[in-house]
A protein has these predicted regions:
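Canonical P-loop GTPase G-domain recognition
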Residues: 231-286
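Hydrophobic core segments of alpha-helical transmembrane domains in multi-pass membrane transport
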Residues: 407-418, 480-485, 563-565, 578-592, ...
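Juxtamembrane inter-helical linkers in multi-pass membrane proteins
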Residues: 433, 437-441, 494-524, 599-623, ...
Length: 780
């Protein structure tokens, strides 16, 4: 029987894990190992993927992958609280554990030397929150796997000569995805002085798997038990001193969200790094397990490769365990000769025979066996946490078979309605009135002061009209980001990926691709960067190329501007139509890509589902401030400069004389060359062509340029009909993203792909806008 056939609510024991390569290794690293108990929680609304519970946390995988995992001993699920037995008093030895558990690897570092730390941990364990507490930085914090997609650096507040690097969240040191490679390369190649390993205390079993691999690196290390406040609230606890003794490293209970225990963590981290106190334990084998098969294997490999590991700069214990599980990248770096490779294979094959498991499963089993001993002796866990019980209740609706899709549509519809018709629209009108009043005051003041007419025109017709028109849409953008950050912080985004996986698979993507694309509704740049969390290069490229079709918030001023001018009272409907048009075109492009450039199937859907959490007010406020600040910076830099340039080109002719009619200006001459391209679309006016060009710098510039050139939406309404306005909206929706987004695509995929995005989306936008205008002309 396979895991695919396990009934909901039943528990079984894993017997074998099929498959091959990096995916199988990833399953083993996530805890799907022989003898592990696994519970079937539920099926996705469309029947695939499934959610299972293993080692105390929820994991999603597809039926095709579940079919590769064989099980037996099917039984009813019984959840028991974890209570350590035979406890004995263990006293805390002091700062840095007083060297009690450590091996000093060298002389203390000289004063003034920079202490570099790697901040490493599983995805969604509070790592970025801790980084912000340590450094005072304001990095993005979320409640779904894959928030950190690049390394970020910062100095520890109040401690000189320190540098902490926030690395992407990983489950193991196996190279399954690009973020795991980033973390692994940093630790192995850049040699940090210390490692701060953050662990989710509500799920220690899963998190300690990475801890054991980090300890094998022989780098001074501190373990931060995060979310201890939740553990205590649920009646659980961790016997910290006993855990320190068993692991051989300092263990510090903290709550990063509440800033508890951070100072003690800093003291321990600085101490072990400064005095070069490496972990006191790196051998996790049981010499009595299957006659010490794994133990003899690892020590035999260590003897064989010791000199090679030293030359390659890889800790010998880490290299031995990775070779034993079949890590090809480590094998390539060691440069073993043919005889040594044959000896290595003989050692591992002998271990497999004695152990009764293949090499990867044997090493994973060795690690989880040690973890179970540690947790059994040190962790007090309730039968079920309040957070988990609450998540199960909420998921009955948000991931239910008949309620998940309607709930998603309802939630997104509510977000758009509140943003564009209620909160955002109300605040935007207030700000617009304020900007208008300020413009009148400045206008009257400059007129009274008899300011030069050219300068007067620059300030009022250029800066105030252009920048002011964009600023009035700030509340709409902030409101949308508020709701998106609430959904992200709560953990709902991960559920959307779970619900949508089967649907996205039909167009060649994984459910995990939905997260970068949802982020793309806020801004394309972080959406493109978030694609790094995808383990498949094929999926990553497809997701990057499709994300620009998701309408970003910078286009909201364009939609609002035209909706107010041509479709009054129907703003929300216009927004919904445009957003769904972008999604539909993205789907069509995905199908085209799947059949041409990116043939093949999407990678397996393996993702952790975090518990729902109440979004932190500080995190939400921080994100809103960042987005507002970014918008204001763009308004007073790119848009400000673009507005002045447009005003100048519109005000003067080729001989730099002031023109009485803007159609005689420099701008009219330049844009006149391009305008005929858009005539078949219903907006072949040079002023609109100019606005579209400036939109490449920043989408908000489209509105500021039109306002400068036309003076008001009323003048624009005399030029365009509602049909041509609809055609223009579709073009703005689909044509090339802004220069910042193109730069991010270039950084991820290279210059050829970035150029392809610019040209391809302009062509698609032209065709779709022409289709709208042509079809509309037949019926209107």
């Amino acid at each position: 029987m396979t895991l695919k056939d396990l009934p909901i609510g039943k528990t079984a024991t894993v017997t074998t894990v099929g498959g091959e390569g990096a995916l199988r290794q990833h399953f083993l690293d996530m805890g799907l190992i022989p003898k592990a108990d696994v519970t079937m929680v539920k099926f996705a609304p469309m029947g695939d993927p499934v959610e299972v519970r293993i080692h105390g946390y929820e994991l999603t995988l597809r039926l095709a992958d579940a079919e590769k995992i064989e099980i037996d001993k099917i039984r009813d699920t019984i959840t028991e609280p974890m209570r350590p037995q035979g406890a004995r008093p263990i006293f805390h030895p002091g700062l840095g554990e007083g060297g009690k558990y450590h091996v000093q690897t060298g002389e203390p570092l000289p004063p003034g030397e920079t202490l570099t730390f790697a901040l490493a941990g599983n995805q969604n364990c509070g790592k970025t929150t801790l980084f912000n507490q340590l450094t005072g930085s304001n990095q993005h914090v979320g409640n779904f796997p894959g928030v950190t997609v690049d390394r970020k650096d910062g100095a520890i507040r109040g401690v000189e000569n320190t540098l902490v690097t926030d690395l992407p969240g990983i489950y193991s040191m196996s190279p399954y995805s690009s973020e795991e490679l980033v973390t692994r390369r940093f630790v192995l190649d850049e040699h940090p002085r210390g490692i701060i390993n953050i662990v989710d205390a509500t799920n220690i079993e899963r998190n300690l798997y990475l801890t054991m691999q980090l300890m094998e690196l022989d780098v001074p290390m501190v373990l931060a038990l995060n979310m201890m406040d939740e553990v205590r609230q649920n009646g659980g606890s961790v016997r910290v001193n006993e855990m320190e003794e068993m692991l051989g490293i300092p263990v510090v209970p903290i709550s990063a969200a509440k800033n508890e225990g951070i100072e003690e963590l800093i003291d321990h981290a600085v101490h072990v790094a400064k005095y070069r106190e490496a972990p006191g334990r790196q051998d996790f084998c049981d010499v009595n397990d299957h006659n010490g098969a794994v133990h003899r294997c690892l020590h035999g490999i260590m003897s064989l490769i010791e000199d090679h590991a030293y030359d390659a700069g890889i800790p010998v214990r880490f290299a031995a365990s990775k070779l034993a599980e079949g890590d090809q990248l480590v094998l390539d770096r060691l440069n073993l000769d043919q005889n040594e490779k044959e000896t290595l294979e003989h050692i591992i094959t002998q271990m497999e025979k004695e152990r009764g498991l293949d090499r990867a499963a044997a090493i994973a089993d060795m690690r989880f066996s040690f973890i179970q001993k540690v947790c059994g002796a040190t962790v007090v866990k309730p039968k079920e946490s309040r957070e988990h019980a609450r998540s199960v209740a909420i998921d009955r609706i948000l991931t239910g078979k008949y309620t998940a899709i309607p709930a998603f549509i309802g939630i997104m519809g509510l977000v758009f309605w509140l943003t564009f018709n209620v909160i955002g629209a109300f605040l935007s009108n207030l700000l617009d009135m304020g900007i208008g009043a300020l413009t009148d005051i400045v206008d009257r003041g400059m007129t009274a002061a008899n300011v030069n007419p050219v300068l007067h025109s620059l300030v009022i017709d250029g800066i105030f009209t252009g920048v002011g028109s964009v600023l009035s849409f700030l509340p709409v953008i902030v409101t949308l980001f508020f709701f998106l950050s609430m959904l992200e912080d709560s953990g709902y985004m991960a559920r959307v990926a779970f619900v949508m996986d089967k649907l996205l698979r039909k167009i060649g993507l994984s459910g995990r691709s939905v997260v970068p694309m949802l982020i793309g509704f806020g801004c394309t740049v972080p959406g493109v960067m978030a694609s790094r969390t995808l383990p498949s290069e094929r999926d990553r490229k497809m997701t990057i190329l499709l994300t620009p079709f998701m309408s970003c918030s910078a286009k909201l001023p364009i939609y609002s501007f035209f909706a107010a001018a041509f479709f009054p009272g129907k703003g929300a409907l216009v927004m919904v139509i445009l957003y769904f048009t972008g999604i539909l075109v993205g789907i069509l492009m995905a199908l085209l890509m799947r059949g041409t450039m990116f043939k093949g199937e999407a990678v397996p859907f393996v993702m952790e589902l975090p518990n729902y959490r109440m979004p932190g007010a500080k995190n939400v406020a921080q994100l809103l401030w960042e987005k507002a600040k970014d918008f204001l910076q763009r308004a007073f830099t790119v848009i400000f400069v673009a507005t002045i340039i447009i005003w100048f080109l519109q005000t003067f002719d080729l001989r730099f004389n002031i023109v009485s009619d803007s159609k005689d200006s420099i701008l009219a001459v330049i844009a006149g060359w391009i305008a005929p391209i858009f005539s078949p679309l219903g907006f072949g006016d040079w002023r609109i062509s100019t606005a579209l060009i400036t939109g490449f710098m920043a989408k908000e510039s489209v509105v500021s340029t039109l306002t400068v050139l036309f003076g008001s939406s009323t003048a624009l309404a005399t030029l365009l009909t509602p049909l041509s306005a609809a055609s223009l909206l579709v073009f703005c929706l689909l044509y090339t993203p802004c220069v910042a987004a193109i730069a991010s695509v270039k950084r991820e995929l290279g210059g050829k792909w970035a150029a392809g995005v610019v040209i391809g989306q302009c062509v698609i936008a032209w065709l779709m806008a022409g289709l709208v205008y042509g079809m509309g002309s037949l019926f209107i």
